[in-house]
Amino acid sequence: MSFKDKDERISCLEAYVTLTSKSSRFTDETEILKMSQRHSGQAGTEAGNGADSPPIVNSKYSTFRDFCSTSSFQDSGYNELKSCSFDNIDKEYLGKKEKGPTLLYEHPETSGLGLTHPLESPTQKKKCILPRKEKDKTPELCETPKISGKKCLPRRRLNVSFALLKGDFESQNSSLESSISQVINLEKNIPSSASGFSRANNFSPLVTSTLKTEEVTSCSQKLRLNFSQQKTSTIDDSKDDCSLFEVECISPIQGNNFKDSITHDFSDSSLCINDENACPELLGSSVSGTTCGTDEDIFVTPISNLVANIRFNASQILSPSPEVRGSISTPEDSGFNSLSLEKSEDSLSDQEGSFQELLQKHKGTPKVGDTIRKTRHLGRSRRLSTLREQSSQSETEEEKQIVHPDSEKRAAAASAISEGQLSSDESGDLTFSLKNLSKTPALQLVHELFMKSKRKRLQENSGHEFLEQGDGEKIAVLQCILAGLIGKKMGIEKLDILTELKYRNLKHILAMVLESLTAESLCSVWKVSRNWREIVVQDKNANRRRKFYITQLKTDSEGAVLNVEDAATRLQLLNRSALRSVQAQARIPGSQREQGSTLSPWGEVLTPLASSSVTHLSSKQEEYVKVAKTLFTDEALKPCPRCQSPAKYQPYKKRGLCSRTACGFDFCVLCLCAYHGSEECSRGAAKPRNRKDALPGSAQSKRNLKRL
């Protein structure tokens, strides 16, 4: 009889192990319920036979007790079993317990301590009835047949898509909850006298533990935690965060149903119990395991969090909302849900940074992982905002012509600054203003331009024109400041220096530049651009020189209109050396210059063009007359070879001196070079004198005159 009961109990235990390994598939739950109903009918027929029938085995609770024994490892789990004692004590059955046989069971997959499962009396069988059949007196067995075939590892089943389970989720969820409630009610109704001996005669381990139940559980679970981290976790050891080992690490949604889960007690169970009042004695600690205090007791294993993953995927597909996203604490290490999180992160708006900052303010001290993730989000949002602001950059180019080629870099920096300012205005953590850019007017201008473009886009929805006027005034002031900025044109290949000097109102520098130019260069400057033309007009001296040069060009092009016979000869004074003393004494009457029509010295009427040249000639003649009054008897006048002004020279010494104080050129009359004294001329005389030529007033000249 004992061997038969042992075989049946082992078959029940193996059936439950199969149920636990296949619990992630909802299709198996329907078969489990059908088989349990079938065995309940058989158990009802056997209940009428008496005490010879096999006792009811609560497979789930036995597995839980096996878990308690195996999870404690070397520390004895006897006290833990004692804490999970049964409440309903049958006093009549205690007297008969000593004679009843006891059976020793071990978990087929573990090598820990064995647990005793005694025979149960018929009176106890009547108490182990499911809630829906409490009125009936037929017990029910939770047994499933062995399933043959290739077993699938639990870790491989994590890759099962939720789309395959979506159709059967609603229909099979109710059956799953009903089966869970059946198992829980079985646990509640199991009597505390489950062992075949009295408490005094129970088998006790050789070494008993002095730790409390919570300490034993936490110690054993810490050992399992180390194993799970070595096998399945990618968590960095340097990061200390108590929230790493929550179910949030795989399912980051905290709902009310999460508080009802007993994942921290049933770490190998993938079932989530929603009944808060179900079997509170079997729970090692409070059910609210979401706080930081119980985070150390929660295991990060894929099997224990399978249902959490399924619920997270269900809530994400069926009812996605951005508000749930705001209330989560995103995990630092989650190799199972990183792909789904990154897909949702790509759809964030540009204000992700400010949203995360607000979340950090409410949560308190920021975490290291959250900081890294926030920088990642900010980098992604910055890249998105840079792509979106390319259109706004074209608008700002229409509003303000930026000549600097490096302004694109400053524009990118200013866009980042403006984004930082917008996000800081929302979060209130940072304060940024133009005071930080007080010494960089160029950056101020670029910043104002980008802020204006952003406000312009905001004003499309709500029309406020007064803000636009304020922006225009700020930009005008900054442009005035930027006009005097030194070094803002650095790096440009071509630069209009004269225009820049004009904008800075540096007229004295422009006057020096124009004075160094010739009249011909001034005419060329006039033809360059409108700005350069205005520069020449503003300088009166340069403009006068330009006009005079133009008149000379016209005179040279049209030629002289003078028809006087000796007009050409009189201009060449070097060829008229014999009559030079006579020409110095000639005068032009002043009455002729006052007449309406200009007359030549010989009484001929001249055209206006010819009169201008004669006027110039008359001024030269007046200079010669003025200098001739100061001549000595042995001196004569000769034009200076450099400035053509009257110069005094001595024929015997062959030396001349310019009368103009500005020139004062001392030259040799023969070679027209600088006076060199008694030395021979470096080059031949300007005009070698003929031997027949005689000095005026000499005997040879008198003879020549007589001969004529």
Swiss-Prot record:
Region span, Disordered: 35-55, 320-426, 682-708
Tissues of expression: Expressed in the testis.
Coiled-coil ranges (or none): none
Processing and modification events after translation: Phosphorylated on Ser-76, Thr-234 and Ser-334 in response to calcium, which is a prerequisite for ubiquitination and proteasomal degradation.
Modified sites of kind Phosphoserine: S76, S334
Role: Required to establish and maintain the arrest of oocytes at the second meiotic metaphase until fertilization. Acts by inhibiting the anaphase-promoting complex/cyclosome (APC/C) ubiquitin ligase. Probably recognizes and binds to some phosphorylated proteins and promotes their ubiquitination and degradation. Plays a vital role in modulating the ubiquitilation of CCNB1 and CDK1 during gametogenesis.
Protein name (record): F-box only protein 43
Organism: Homo sapiens (Human)
